[in-house]
């Protein structure tokens, strides 16, 4: 996700890439407490805290807790940053709170900044493309390159064409056309 953010940042100068990267790092941090990971393997059992509070709320709580610890530091060096630390905290909280994109999908707020919108779409794109990759490995094949539906993707999966490559006798495509 960070590579996607860094790749699109030059195309959208209104994005604060540092804030976006911080949002990428923290947006799902609450899942560490939402999900219960058994010692015997990577199985996510249900957890009461996660069910009652959810990873977004837990992530917001985590960032606030870390910020309080930083605020207690006697050093004033971090207090004079630009933009002001409190503004950064507020915007980071917004990124975490809005990363599901809409309230109907669990976000307490809709994305209201370019970074929040970018994080939502980067996260969504990452999740969906991972679903395709996993589906090609686990879904039942129905025909050549066609697989049964993997929820929540729409319809059956169709495997992509192979990556285009010029044959040895052909010249490379003209990059200037792109």
Q: What is the role of each PLM region?
A:
Residues 112-178:
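Acidic, carboxylate-rich catalytic segments that either coordinate divalent cations
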Residues 4:
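A Trp-anchored, charged/polar loop motif used as the substrate-binding/catalytic surface
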Residues 1:
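Short, surface-exposed polybasic-aromatic patches that bind anionic ligands, especially phosphate groups
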Residues 7-141:
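Divalent metal-dependent catalytic cores for phosphoryl transfer on phosphate-bearing substrates
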